[in-house]
Design a protein with these regions (language model features):
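Mixed-charge, low-complexity intrinsically disordered regions
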Residues: 1-101, 113-230
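Conserved positions in beta-strands of structured domains
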Residues: 14, 106-109
Length: 230
């Protein structure tokens, strides 16, 4: 039986990431990352959020809108395996899927009433680009959603060690104080593709309206420049 379903975004995420580069590979890896969930006008009804304040964490169901493809492949190359080993798409969290749907667990830091955007959700630890469409929100329920005994397959442990981050004082001054911890956390996760390890190469990405450039040698990441994002 052939079926199709049409869905529309209920909200959009507003985060510090203007591009995919730099976005943490999973939610919760950088707890200090702040973002907001702003509902579409049709769904700005406070009754729909009644009771959500009692939960510390929520699930975001969202769309890989930057990775939509007409065709799909049954196997993909997970970056954490070096980009050479193929695994079944349903054994990975690759964005290149038959239905480009994603799931992120984030901390609900607060709910704020605004005059022009209705109730806005303040969240921590998100792994989404700015503007990402949200399809649904569900509460995280510890007794049902937490499984400490679960096996993690080829992703049983975090991907690699965190890096030592060096930001020269004159560059750190360019970063707003309320973004410094988050920036360090993002850089410590090593934003580079896993298969790239050129100590001479300078990488760059947009974060909180800034263009951050860095290089990595061994286990140390050094920020080379911070400027206003164009």
């Amino acid at each position: 039986m052939h079926q199709e379903f049409t869905m529309r975004p209920i909200a959009r995420i507003h985060s510090d990431f203007s591009t995919k580069f730099g976005v943490p590979r999973q939610s919760g890896l950088v707890d200090s990352l702040e973002a907001t969930v702003v509902f579409e006008p049709e769904f700005r009804n406070s009754d729909a959020l009644r009771g959500l304040e009692g939960f510390s964490h929520i699930w975001l169901v969202w769309v890989f809108d930057q990775a939509v493809r007409k065709d799909w492949s049954p196997t993909v190359r997970p970056p954490r395996l070096g980009g050479n080993t193929r695994m079944g798409v349903f054994a990975t969290r690759s964005p290149f899927r038959p239905n480009p749907i994603a799931l992120s667990c984030v901390k609900l830091a607060g709910m704020e009433e605004t005059a022009d955007r209705g109730t806005v959700l303040r969240i921590l630890g998100a792994d989404l680009m700015d503007g990402t469409p949200i399809l649904d929100i569900k509460p995280y329920i510890p007794y049902a959603d937490s499984h400490p005994e679960a096996l993690g397959g080829f992703a049983a442990v975090p991907a690699g060690e965190t890096l030592e981050v060096v930001i020269p004082p004159e560059l750190l001054e360019k970063v707003p104080e309320n973004r410094r911890e988050a920036l360090r956390g993002v850089l410590a996760q090593d934003p580079r593709p896993h298969y790239q390890d050129d100590p001479e190469r300078v990488y760059g990405f947009g974060f909180a309206g800034m263009e951050v450039k860095f290089s990595v040698k061994g286990k140390q990441l050094t920020v080379r420049d911070i400027s206003s994002e164009i």
